[in-house]
């Protein structure tokens, strides 16, 4: 069985994701496509613009057969941990092939991933404070493999390859050339595919839904029509300000990835910042990327500590969000062989455990923002 896996955020699901899904179907044939998707919080350190259930439905309607939630402690992370979580989950769920979009599918990701995975860990520790960790890491990679990888999706593809190599290469890697606008580019109205960032900006700036019809599926547009509020950092900024002003330095030092005196910088600059964008500019330095600072801001807002994240890894589970008829058949046949607990219903007992417990806790804020329960009382969506 040639089960194909995809690691994604679908923030939101758009025509570029649909193209990749179609390419995955060419590989899978009649076998299932499994998507491991970030929940209500995404890698760049933000709330997803649409809840996980709506995004999972769009994925199934576009051709996926099963959508599982990537736990928060992997989803809101730098590329290496994000990729590790996604590849590990897909492997445990029986996937044999990983399909992902990149700027140049001709790169030998399996070879590069194997090379990088063998670099001693001590050579991946950097002390040049004039550059970000990611910049220094990319420079090291270029030296080791003799090829500079700088495009965002290629960097993530390389992270998948390294994670796969570290796990013993259980997945065949199938990179696919991206189409349309690049990552984080401004809106290009003539383009068949827009970047997710451009679409989010359009939505947050009050675009008419009719403007989005060429880039978003009808079901996704209908979901946006039903939303009273679209989560974003400017909406959350007052809560972050309260959190930083009310917490002690000692409390802030317990926050996951709070290091090198950033707790003092955060606490000092929050008083002066007019909004979240201004706050990020004030705390930015050559040492940290904006993505790292957004993630740290999110950990702070949600009071996610180092202990919370480490403890969550003691019991890793995944929540089934949506499935097709083909997906249901695959689950029935293979579930007993999966090397991971699949959660179909959150109850008072399992809501205290591992990655699920952390996810349920952080989702509480998302629920307050959007006004809808995200875990208790929810069951996987069957989409035909």
Curated annotation (Swiss-Prot):
Gene3D superfamilies: HUPs
Catalytic activity: cytidine(34) in elongator tRNA(Met) + acetate + ATP = N(4)-acetylcytidine(34) in elongator tRNA(Met) + AMP + diphosphate
Entry-linked InterPro entries: Rossmann-like_a/b/a_fold, tRNA(Met)_cyd_acetate_ligase
Enzyme Commission number, as recorded: 6.3.4.-
Keyword Iron listed: no
Disulfide bonds: none
A GO cellular component entry from the record: cytoplasm
Binding site residues for ATP: 7-20, 101, 153, 178
Top-level taxon: Bacteria
Keywords: ATP-binding, Cytoplasm, Ligase, Nucleotide-binding, RNA-binding, tRNA processing, tRNA-binding
SUPFAM superfamilies membership: Nucleotidylyl transferase
GO biological process, one term: tRNA modification
GO molecular function, one term: ligase activity, forming carbon-nitrogen bonds
Family: Belongs to the TmcAL family.
Function text: Catalyzes the formation of N(4)-acetylcytidine (ac(4)C) at the wobble position of elongator tRNA(Met), using acetate and ATP as substrates. First activates an acetate ion to form acetyladenylate (Ac-AMP) and then transfers the acetyl group to tRNA to form ac(4)C34.
Protein name: tRNA(Met) cytidine acetate ligase
Organism: Lactobacillus delbrueckii subsp. bulgaricus (strain ATCC 11842 / DSM 20081 / BCRC 10696 / JCM 1002 / NBRC 13953 / NCIMB 11778 / NCTC 12712 / WDCM 00102 / Lb 14)
